[in-house]
Amino acid sequence: MKIPEKILYAHEHTAIDLSGPKNNIDCRLDDFDATVAEYRHLVERGVVSIIDQTNRGMGRNVAYTEKVAAAAGVKITHATGYYKEPFLPPECYTLTEQQLSDIMVRELTVGIEDTGIRAELIGEIGTSKEITEPEAKIFRAASRAHAETGAPICTHTTLGTRGMEQLEIFKSFGVDLSRVVLSHIDLSADLDYMKRLLDQGVNIAFDTIGKCNYQPDGSRAMWLSRLCREGYENQIVMSMDITRRSNFADRGGVGYSYLLDTFAPMACEAGVPEQTFEKLLYRNALRIYKGQSEASV
């Protein structure tokens, strides 16, 4: 199949460090040369932009990420917000909902820390299998920041769960669900659940491609085909969400280009029309995260 000329990866982490709570150094990404090599290969395949979902408490390093972007020749968009327990920094427990929202607004409108580089989205904010009160507080704070700035929001769902509960919080604040992406929904094996979410007007991400220890990619391809055939192709974005060094190609992993080289042809064979991939791999994410403007990509 012919992949689109322009591609936008909707959920990645250029620098991330979840190694502490996970007690696993593999969950730290900080190898500059290896990351640049992976990203350069993506650029060769047509990737023009990457949405970096790393936020406060996840090991975000904007200066490092900008150096990777410059070396690889790709645009990287930065995020603000907080992840989920047990990865939340102390401020999530000591500050009020409004104070947390104010931090997000500042990073969106003024800049992240002392870099002068502004975040362009709130993400990835997450929930555990059961939503904890600190996590709910972050969702409320993010909703307030969205109301003030109009910034898009990306969430983390644990194995695809609690999507409806996340939406209920957003709805209570009047969040524009067309600017919201629920991540990792491809980890849910429930196609009806996926459709119920999409029927709310929200977007979902098939962004754990290649993580076959959770779900086989053949199933992902089948679900994607069904959703596209049933008219949801404008509400789905795609990515790899690589967070482990062992996922890199030079470490024997699938590598970032697996989505384009292996999964996209698999999904095409499963029934996703070739022309639909421009939406799945570029246009949808452009609309959600960039407001259709290609000038900022």
Where are these regions (language model features)?
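Catalytic pocket-lining loop regions of alpha/beta-barrel enzymes
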Residues: A147-M222, R226, I236
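Short acidic/histidine-rich active-site segments
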Residues: Q53, D207-T208, Y232-G253
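Active-site gating/metal-coordination segments in enzymes
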Residues: K67-A70, K75-T149, N203, T208-N213
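Divalent metal-coordination and catalytic microenvironments
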Residues: H11, I50, Y82, H146, ...
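Mid-to-C-terminal alpha-helical segments outside catalytic/metal-binding sites
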Residues: M1, Y258-V297
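Histidine/acidic-residue-rich catalytic or RNA/ligand-binding cores of hydrolases
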Residues: L18-K22, V62, G163-I169, L191-L197, ...
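Acidic/histidine-rich helix-loop elements
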Residues: I16-D30, P90-L95, N247, R251-G252
